[in-house]
């Protein structure tokens, strides 16, 4: 699953940057919250933005959304399917939050977070090899850490 997500994100980055490289792959961390441990897998992907990226940061972000890790592939088809299946807008869910200080962008895709009204949404990735019961257990585990 992680390899698929990395490939999707490399493709997203290729829309806005050149010389895309995978700097670090499958960094595993254990996160602890309220005496519960969950595993987190991440990778670092890097590319060269255009020299005038500061004036284009909004367009750059827009071109990359929704993140391939959310939509899957092929993105135009999967986003159309999601829109047809989900009858109400996602709001902030699966968007991004972060800041741009003029040089650096630090952001995260909002897949597990609390809304101001106290509602909570959570998602997970599936592939054609996914096992429904395993995916459900992973979802429960990932919900548990931030809520409890």
Predicted regions mapped to residue ranges:
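Short, mixed-charge, low-aromatic patches
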Residues: 1, 26-32, 96-99
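A conserved active-site cap/scaffold subdomain adjacent to cofactor or substrate pockets
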Residues: 1-14
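Generic beta-strand/beta-sheet core signal
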Residues: 6, 25, 121-123
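Short helix/loop capping segments that flank catalytic or ligand/cofactor-binding pockets
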Residues: 13-16, 129-131
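Metal-dependent phosphodiester-processing active-site neighborhood
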Residues: 15-39
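Conserved hydrophobic core element of enzyme catalytic domains
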Residues: 36-148
